[in-house]
């Protein structure tokens, strides 16, 4: 396939690589769920040593050991998948930036594994535990993006509508994704600080809109609630923008509506987490769906940039020859 003006159509020829990338992203999502399960059940220190478990490869699977050891097993699977993905990509992928993405993913999962080990060995220090959670979400985003990059249809869209709102959508989705990531970090601080029920009622806070700020636990909990409100505003703004200016483009409409649906589920799970006294299932699901919200927003962001770039390339192709080179250099810069 000839390279497009934007460079997006020079896709990987390997469907197998794409399928492995999708599998890696899916198993990473499972890893995040299991990690949330470990925290929700208080099992993070059920196995006190690392990388072994009670001095063995396979410990006796009782009580919280099941969750913590299961978390380690899934993590090992993700490391192996990512290693295979990186090696395969280096040999099969033409695009250097995609190869670099695969290598970055492998480096990130190694950092994540080491942070997990340090978290156990140092008995859950807050900073390391939060860094572990933050890296997990970042790695999940990389796997989702990589799965999109290796899709043989990535960027291969023929009908692209270009209007003045395209750059604004790319900017808006980027901000929305960043806000969601920050909100997840605040949630990680709250979880590892043990402040999930510092404000025991919802939607009010101790019966008021604003709670008494008498402890760091209340401060962090209320910050997470305020963050949820900010995320909701940006997500709705993003979806409304897509539906108003890009409703005919299914590559944007579908993830936008998916983002809205997941946001509704996430807010509902957050409420049930409080109402249930942090029951394991809604609390863990809240962590997992939060990751899904982030990944969906990222997918929408990538598509906004890609489709906008393709539209720019299409415009450049229609420009008379004396000007086309200058526009092409501007697009690819």
Cite the ranges covered by each PLM segment:
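Polytopic transmembrane helical bundles with strong interfacial aromatic enrichment
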Residues: 1-333
């Amino acid at each position: 396939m000839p390279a497009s003006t934007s460079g997006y159509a020079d896709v990987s020829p390997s469907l197998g690589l794409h399928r492995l990338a999708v599998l890696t992203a899916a198993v990473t999502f499972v890893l995040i769920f299991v990690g949330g399960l470990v925290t929700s059940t208080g099992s993070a220190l059920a196995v006190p040593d690392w990388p072994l478990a009670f001095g063995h490869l396979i410990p006796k699977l009782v009580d919280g050991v099941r969750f913590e050891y299961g978390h380690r097993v899934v993590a090992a699977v993700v490391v192996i998948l990512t290693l295979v993905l990186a090696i395969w990509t280096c040999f099969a992928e033409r695009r250097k930036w995609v190869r670099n993405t695969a290598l970055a993913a492998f480096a990130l999962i190694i950092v994540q594994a080491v942070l997990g080990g340090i978290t156990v060995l140092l008995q859950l220090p807050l900073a390391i535990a939060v860094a572990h959670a933050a890296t997990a979400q970042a790695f999940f985003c990389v796997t989702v993006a990589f799965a999109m990059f290796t899709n043989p249809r990535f960027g291969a869209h023929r009908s692209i509508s270009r209007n003045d709102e395209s750059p604004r959508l790319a900017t808006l989705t980027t901000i929305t994704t960043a806000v969601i990531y920050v909100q997840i970090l605040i949630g990680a601080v709250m979880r590892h600080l043990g402040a999930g029920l510092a404000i025991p009622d919802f939607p009010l806070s101790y019966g008021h809109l604003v709670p008494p700020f008498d402890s760091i636990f209340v401060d962090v909990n209320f910050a997470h609630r305020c963050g949820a409100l900010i995320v909701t505003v940006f997500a709705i703004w993003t979806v409304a923008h897509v539906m108003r200016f890009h409703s005919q483009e299914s590559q944007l409409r579908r993830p936008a509506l998916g983002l809205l649906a997941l946001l509704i589920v996430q807010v509902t799970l957050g409420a049930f987490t409080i109402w249930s006294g942090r029951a394991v299932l809604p609390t863990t699901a809240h962590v997992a769906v939060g990751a899904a919200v982030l990944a969906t927003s990222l997918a929408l962001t990538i598509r906004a940039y890609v489709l906008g770039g393709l539209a720019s390339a299409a415009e450049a192709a229609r420009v008379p020859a004396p000007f086309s080179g200058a526009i092409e250099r501007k697009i690819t810069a």
